[in-house]
Amino acid sequence: LRSPSSRSLNPWHFVVVTDKKLIEDLSQSKPHGAAFLKNAPLAIVVCADPQVSDVWIEDCSIAALNLHLAAADIGLGSCWIQIRERQYDQSLSSEAYVQKTLELKEGMRVEAIIAIGYPKEEKEGQPKASLLYERVSYEKFGQTK
């Protein structure tokens, strides 16, 4: 619950979900990229009050990344499910769907859902050759070392 935050305003709020029915409901929050959530034992919905900070999106993203790192540190797998700016269907946003499902207070925004559980497989790390060194500039944009 200690994550870097602009001006230490901490606009984020986490909704920890372990109820299987609620997790299944959340797994339907968008047509693609969320269905796997139904098999996870834990979902953490990363929300924020935008009245607290104008950079709530950035602060929530940092906090969510810390959740990923904490999960990995104790041997758990995690996966980000983007909610903000996604659609549940043609008439309802994923965010509105999650807000309704979790009965969030009015004005509370939803950034993402972090699925957490035991990974089915152990994936190898990325090879050093895949690092995108060309996306790093030194001193000025486009300048290589």
Language-model segments: which ranges?
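Acidic, surface-exposed loops and disordered segments
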Residues: 1-145
